[in-house]
UniProtKB/Swiss-Prot annotation:
GO terms for cellular component: cytoplasm. It catalyses: adenosine(37) in tRNA1(Val) + S-adenosyl-L-methionine = N(6)-methyladenosine(37) in tRNA1(Val) + S-adenosyl-L-homocysteine + H(+). It is an enzyme of class 2 (transferase). Its EC number is 2.1.1.223. Pfam families: MTS. It comes from Haemophilus influenzae (strain ATCC 51907 / DSM 11121 / KW20 / Rd). Specifically methylates the adenine in position 37 of tRNA(1)(Val) (anticodon cmo5UAC). One of its GO terms (biological process) is methylation. This is tRNA1(Val) (adenine(37)-N6)-methyltransferase. Disulfide bonds: none annotated. It is found in: Cytoplasm. The keyword S-adenosyl-L-methionine applies. Keywords: Cytoplasm, Methyltransferase, S-adenosyl-L-methionine, Transferase, tRNA processing. One of its GO terms (molecular function) is tRNA (adenine-N6)-methyltransferase activity.
């Protein structure tokens, strides 16, 4: 699908290696945006997360999107320009580590749907390999993000379930919210939505099931995503 239409914006994705997927939509709808004035989207791809978060936040919230791949960055910029939030979203085409090392800005919320295979069979094209595979671990991404996080800020990731478990055990940051994502009732979790903070809080844990036993969307999934999906 070269174009994905949401209730308040469109995503053109014919030039992007990684298309709009459930992981990104879940993160964009789930991340806590209360009191956010500055948000960072690490590795923005099509611009999906930046646009979802712009829809969910107040007019005084500014969003910085960063994307390394020039082709994806160009299409993300087009998607941003076609939205009503183009004046609130700034996109920079640069390596995320370099960006974080050179910016003086701190962020109240940092989000990422990071590359999720750290090793494996090579992808068929360079852009898709760049989007899916990483020589840097998820812990690297989290530690980089923490350097520009405001004192009471949050970092939210979506990861494969086992990678999420590993990350929570590896970081010095505090995991304050964890939602295990189950594709269909009765199955084991496949994804994990995580929020980290600098200060300790009581961990909130729950689960989200996408499909019920009859292969219908659950009420919880509909409630979470209804502001975005046309079908809801």
């Amino acid at each position: 699908m070269s174009r994905f239409t949401f209730k308040q914006f469109h995503i053109n994705q014919n030039s992007c290696a990684m298309k709009v997927g459930t992981d990104g939509i879940l993160l964009g709808a789930w991340a806590d945006v209360k009191h956010c004035k500055n948000i960072l989207d690490m590795g923005c791809g099509t611009g999906l997360l930046a646009l979802m978060l712009a829809q969910r936040t107040e007019e005084n919230c500014q969003i910085q999107a960063v994307e390394l791949d020039p082709i994806a960055a160009k299409q993300a910029q087009e998607n941003i320009n076609n939205s009503v939030w183009k004046n609130r979203i700034q996109l920079t085409q640069v390596d995320i580590q370099h960006f974080l090392q050179t910016t003086e800005q701190t962020f109240d919320l940092i989000v990422a749907n990071p590359p999720y295979f750290e090793q494996g069979i090579a992808c068929k094209n360079e852009e898709r390999e760049l989007a899916r595979y990483t020589k840097q671990s998820h812990l690297n991404w989290l530690e980089w993000a923490a350097t520009r996080l405001s004192e009471n800020g949050r970092i939210s990731f979506v990861l494969p379930y086992e990678a999420g478990k590993t990350l929570t055990k590896s970081t010095a940051l505090f995991c304050i919210k964890q939602t295990n994502v189950i594709t269909k009732i009765g199955k084991t979790p496949q994804r994990m939505l995580l929020t980290f903070a600098k200060q300790p809080e009581v961990l909130m844990q729950d689960q989200l099931v996408i499909y019920d036993a009859d292969n219908q969307y659950t009420e919880a999934f509909i409630e979470l995503t209804k502001d975005f999906y046309l079908k809801f």
